[in-house]
Amino acid sequence: MEKTEISDVIIVGAGIIGLAIAHSISQHGRNVQIIERSKPGSGESTKTGGGIRLVHGSEMNIQLSQLSFDTWLHFKKHFKIDPYYRETGHLFLSSKNTNSFLTQVDLLKKMDIDSDVLTKSQISSRWPQLSEMNFSQGIYCEKGGYLDQHRVLRGYLETVTSNGVKIEADTRVYGIIKDKNRIIGVETTSGDYRADWIINAAGPQAGKIAALAGLEIPFISRRHELLILEASAAVPEEIPWLIDVDRQVHMRPDGSGRALVGGFLGHDDPVDPDTSSPGLSEEWSKNVRLEASESFRVTDPESKVMQGWSGLYPGTIDYMPVIEEPLPGFVTAAGF
């Protein structure tokens, strides 16, 4: 007879979202069980640039960033691990003379986020290292930067484990258990698990977990790639995270003259998370270095690559996360 585990809460997915939810719930003494299809913290949460930003195009995403911001600033105090947070700020750049940046800053200021639209001359005056750039305007927000996502995941994992959270790794969910109209558990490759609440925090797999419950939620995944350019790139440490919204390329300093570069370069079509290639594209690597060089004028298109990786941005069609209880006992927390 297969085992049946009973908990207060089951969380599907042990990425940053699932672990953060487990942390919050376990702080209140609840019995939490996480089901993870691979290893905890080994999915898309590690395949990012570690970005922490407050600049978004919607009130919801701005609010979510505001709510989490203090967590990153005080992470070491609460999780006993330094996330190596570095505040660079963000500078969104465009060569187009439109009012969209003014509209964006109005929204940010409405949400109590200090930001400004800067002209080309103001950008050059503030950061002489960027005087060769050819943008007409930029949005600058001083708050925000990047951290080491691996250390953050480790901090969450160690803390939830010490709180008594159980994690069933290398286990796939293939069915949903119902009692009348309420979701009461999941069927997995390791047996059945039942709980008062099931939370779908499965990242790129969230749509498939939702489908098991009979739901059709428009989750999509977009493939992205990132490179670390070696120190000979000599990228100034004082510059902010630079984002060219026209070319869809971005760059930030990564310490000791290194740079992190990435971007969709106009290609952000949805991909199937089960068939998406995990490797790097040589063509993309060449193109992104060229685009970053032409956009920001602080790196060379022939800069050598120290490290690179690809991953998926789990999201939705409109870039808005889904946080809801679509069925009794079943909560969705995905699309971030």
Regions found by a protein language model. Give the residues of each.
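N-terminal Rossmann-like FAD-binding beta1-loop-alpha1 element of flavoenzymes
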Residues: 7-33
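Glycine-rich FAD pyrophosphate-binding loop
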Residues: 26-46
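Short beta-strand to alpha-helix junction loop
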Residues: 63-64, 92-100, 139-158, 277-283
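Central helical "cap/lid" subdomain
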Residues: 42, 192-240
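Dinucleotide-binding Rossmann-like beta1-alpha1 core, especially the glycine-rich loop
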Residues: 50-126, 248-250
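Active-site lid/adjacent beta-loop-alpha segment flanking the redox-cofactor pocket in flavoenzymes
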Residues: 231-329
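Glycine-rich phosphate/pyrophosphate-binding beta-alpha loops
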Residues: 51, 144-146, 248, 312-314, ...
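Helical element adjacent to the flavin cofactor pocket in flavoenzyme catalytic cores
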Residues: 140-196
